[in-house]
Amino acid sequence: MLIVFPDLHGRSDLLEAAIQHYPQDTQFVFLGDAIDRGPDSRGTVRQLVELHDAGRMTLLCGNHEWMLLTAAEFARQAQETDDEAYHQAALERFANWERNGGTSVQEEFGGFNPDTVPTELLEYFSRLQLLFDGPGGVLCSHAAPPALVQRYGSVEETMLWARPNDGPFALPSEVTASVHGHTPLAQPTWVGQHLYLDLGAFLTGALSAFDLESLEMIVFQGQGSVPREHLPELRSGQSNLIRTQTCTVVEV
């Protein structure tokens, strides 16, 4: 088994329940956004790092990790060069991260700034990669495959920030499909060759899990404050490309 999980946003309870559902030899891929917004970013990161270091989890970078790690990197460069431009860039990235849900992580760690990002988080960031090449030519990344959407400025930023409505995206010749998180939807959804898995776990208590080998989909349903039926569904201009993924629901 090779199971892909989307955004967790501090839902360590859902991650733990999902991991326990599968046999001990199961391999996992996490699509990024472990931190921010939810109740236990710290515990989520610890679990992911433990699984990674045990050789069971491939960790991908999400836009929430990217905001904080780039703030920390600019702060490091400011210290090394005494360049005010780096200092300002660090403050801007850090403020953007806080506006996008980072205050929950600040509270968990008792507060910090770009110069003092906790070692736990930096060690987690050091294990992240941007994409994963799975079996059968299936590519995994946080938000989109490695393509350039001009308004995001670079391929890397597109992979971290793009939305389904920015696509469908051209895939590399050897890639048959791609799997992503990032955009919360009411149900796992295909748009052309792209599968979107994020069900807004931190709000809905729903975490999808897609097996890249058997193509089985499970939704682990825990406690949430918002029914996932209230999340958006993709419609309109891409209707001929959109189809939902059949899944089994497991209450946790």
Spans of model-derived segments:
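Active-site neighborhood of divalent metal-dependent phosphoester bond hydrolases
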Residues: 38, 42-45, 49-130, 165-169
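Short, glycine/acidic-enriched loop or turn micro-motifs at the edges of active sites
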Residues: 9-10, 36, 66, 145, ...
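A short C-terminal boundary segment appended to hydrolase-like catalytic domains
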Residues: 239-252
